[in-house]
């Protein structure tokens, strides 16, 4: 039996990147999956995992729209009966200098990275409270609360907010049997990281990823499956005394005082 056997997990932003990695790890640990995404690609992953014998349901929704989220959660519960674990993973990042960033791009981060998390949590939490049992895993970042990079002001703002939300929910609903913890990844080899690299250097994005890796003590970007294993730990009984925590998985990237050429 896996550490998540018999549990049903709703994972947002699951069609690619970290969300896909979490879905694959959760399936390996025995969870029943509800994969929520705005992209049609979510059906492909659900079909693949289902074809391998995992119980997996895909639901389409825009996390910015509370009515859309409510409808998706209702459809999912018709299939699975309940949601034991929520992984708020859906997120975006667009580079832009603070003074040059449009209100549209600013709100794009706020609407998905903050309001989206708020909406999905609000739709799922009441039934967890009724059962007095639930695990919520938030996807924050080292960016925002710990470090900052030029061009990522809106992203940093949104991810720092998730830390505050995590701690507040952990305190507010601890007596209801709900545990809430955040994951703070550094650079992970995902379509988002590749998009940031293309925005930084359209002519040679791979060189940007190479430089990212050089600045990390472990000299590589994380694999989404590694983040998935941390999420599985936080969603399982193995972390039964953890709530309100920030769990950094960054290969040591936040350790150096400055980037060095090495010795």
Curated annotation (Swiss-Prot):
GO molecular function: oxidoreductase activity
CDD domains: DHRS6_like_SDR_c
Residues binding substrate, per UniProt: 141
Entry keyword set: Oxidoreductase
Binding residues for NAD(+): 10-32
SMART domains: PKS_KR
Family according to the record: Belongs to the short-chain dehydrogenases/reductases (SDR) family.
NCBIfam families the record matches: PRK07231.1, PRK08226.1
Protein name (record): Oxidoreductase UcpA
Originating organism: Salmonella typhimurium (strain LT2 / SGSC1412 / ATCC 700720)
Organism taxonomic ancestry: Bacteria, Pseudomonadati, Pseudomonadota, Gammaproteobacteria, Enterobacterales
């Amino acid at each position: 039996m896996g550490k998540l056997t018999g549990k049903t997990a709703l994972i947002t932003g699951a069609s690619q990147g970290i969300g896909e990695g979490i879905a694959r790890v959760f399936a390996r640990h025995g969870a029943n999956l509800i994969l929520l995404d705005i992209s049609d690609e979510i059906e492909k992953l659900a079909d693949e995992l289902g074809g391998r014998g995992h119980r997996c349901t895909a639901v389409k929704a825009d996390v910015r729209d509370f009515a859309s989220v409510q409808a998706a959660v209702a459809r999912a519960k018709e299939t699975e009966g309940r949601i034991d674990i929520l992984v708020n993973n859906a997120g975006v990042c667009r580079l832009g200098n603070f003074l040059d960033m449009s209100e549209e791009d600013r709100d794009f981060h706020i609407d998905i990275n903050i309001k989206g998390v708020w909406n999905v949590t609000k739709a799922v939490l009441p039934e967890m409270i009724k059962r007095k049992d639930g695990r919520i895993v938030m996807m924050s970042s080292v960016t925002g609360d710990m470090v900052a990079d030029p061009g990522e002001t809106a992203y940093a703002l949104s991810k720092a907010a998730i830390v505050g939300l995590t701690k507040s929910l952990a305190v507010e609903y601890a007596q209801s049997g709900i545990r809430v913890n955040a994951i703070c990844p550094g650079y992970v080899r995902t379509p988002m990281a590749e998009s940031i690299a293309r925005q930084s250097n359209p002519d040679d994005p791979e060189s940007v990823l190479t430089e990212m890796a050089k600045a990390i003590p472990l000299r590589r970007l994380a694999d989404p499956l590694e983040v998935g294993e941390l999420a599985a730990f936080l969603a399982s009984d193995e972390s039964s005394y953890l709530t309100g925590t920030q769990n950094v998985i960054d290969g040591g990237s936040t350790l150096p005082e400055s980037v060095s050429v090495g010795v």
